[in-house]
Amino acid sequence: MSHLDNGFRSLTLQRFPATDDVNPLQAWEAADEYLLQQLDDTEIRGPVLILNDAFGALSCALAEHKPYSIGDSYISELATRENLRLNGIDESSVKFLDSTADYPQQPGVVLIKVPKTLALLEQQLRALRKVVTSDTRIIAGAKARDIHTSTLELFEKVLGPTTTTLAWKKARLINCTFNEPQLADAPQTVSWKLEGTDWTIHNHANVFSRTGLDIGARFFMQHLPENLEGEIVDLGCGNGVIGLTLLDKNPQAKVVFVDESPMAVASSRLNVETNMPEALDRCEFMINNALSGVEPFRFNAVLCNPPFHQQHALTDNVAWEMFHHARRCLKINGELYIVANRHLDYFHKLKKIFGNCTTIATNNKFVVLKAVKLGRRR
């Protein structure tokens, strides 16, 4: 846990999933402080929109203004709810919207934590363009190293005149005034042909590797299991290419597509609808934090290409949680398959959790591993 003192309220905040005491990661950053310093309670008029509030620092601080928290991360929503409870703030004070929803009209203040991908930022700025006015105060913040010329040009192109502040605690702010510049329409998704198939893969703005098949998934697809039955999971499904391939290779199985990103789940659904519509009745689509709340002993197999970062921070906490959830939800003799960068040494992590691990394939960059749930080992 970490403490954030600001002009609105003193907060105790924690990350979600929680980090361990040996390698603690803070649930807020200097950019959050810097953004809050720009606001005065008496100056806030109209709806407050907060975009990409990773762990709820801004939403908790401004809770009395009934802000809208907008983003593409269910984990961020869970983190914000947990931090609201931790600080004794009514959860209903914050309204949650995903990035594809319609934003509230004529906001008084818009606070943006600059996301990792320009594609998501552009999608969000285009959505804001439909609702902001010249009187809306628009401020974005990030680590100074994460604000580039391309970031500023995007604000200018979509919204209007843009300036930056001096760096403070290695954070920088962007101030933008809306003046409705001329702007061509843009497609909601980026599409490309998947080599070796007749499939066209559609990707919403925040999908990992949205402009082409990432090399980890390419390697994984060469070693996926075949002729499985029952329910199998594409965990952290992204655009759903792994799940699509599983549907093709396992015609007797049902595939559950799971991701914490609403845009990823929407992309997976779209890709099944457009490429294998006849398989829709063998699919389930789930926005979730890994397999939280899913009953134990349900699945025959779980397949996963786990992330090793959360927002801008490198961490294996998300992967560790995925592995534990997979073990809980697998049937006895159910199998977990993962692909990962070799340097992450997930072999020993899986062996610790499952009591076994087998290397299925390896190259100079990636490894495909399999672990089997052998019993009720804790």
Swiss-Prot record:
Main enzyme class: transferase
InterPro entries linked: DNA_methylase_N6_adenine_CS, rRNA_m2G-MeTrfase_RlmG, RsmC/RlmG, SAM-dependent_MTases_sf, Small_mtfrase_dom
The reaction(s) this protein catalyses: guanosine(1835) in 23S rRNA + S-adenosyl-L-methionine = N(2)-methylguanosine(1835) in 23S rRNA + S-adenosyl-L-homocysteine + H(+)
Subcellular location, principal: cytoplasm
Key word Cell membrane present: no
Subcellular location: Cytoplasm
GO annotations of cellular component type: cytoplasm
Function field: Specifically methylates the guanine in position 1835 (m2G1835) of 23S rRNA.
Protein name, per record: Ribosomal RNA large subunit methyltransferase G
Organism of origin: Escherichia coli (strain K12)
